[in-house]
Curated annotation (Swiss-Prot):
Described function: Serine protease inhibitor. Inhibits trypsin (Ki=12nM) and weakly inhibits chymotrypsin with (Ki=460nm). Does not inhibit bacterial subtilisin.
Any one GO cellular component localisation term in the record: extracellular region
Name of the protein in its database record: Bowman-Birk type proteinase inhibitor A4
Tissue: Expressed in bulb (at protein level).
SMART domains to which the protein is assigned, alphabetical: BowB (SM00269)
Claim: Disulfide bond is one of the keywords in the record: yes
Taxonomic path: Eukaryota, Viridiplantae, Streptophyta, Embryophyta, Tracheophyta
Length: 67
């Protein structure tokens, strides 16, 4: 797995794999962002009330999870 320092940040990690050590886990990030990170393999557009184009990475990836 990639080093923790090089992973994209995620404020709210949703579903995660259950591996040991914890650094081996991949998660789905629940953050809605202006642009998906480079390593995202399934970037989906999210409908918002503001009309601004926002996206969510819906694939399991390596993140630095805040929560």
């Amino acid at each position: 797995w990639p080093p923790v320092e090089g992973r994209p940040s995620c404020k709210r990690c949703g579903a995660c794999t259950r591996m040991w050590p914890p650094e081996a886990n991949r998660c789905v990030c629940d953050d809605i962002v202006p642009q998906c990170h480079e390593g995202c393999s399934k970037c989906e557009k999210v409908d918002t009330r503001s009309g601004k184009p926002l996206y969510q990475c819906q694939s399991f990836e390596y993140y630095n999870c805040a929560a």
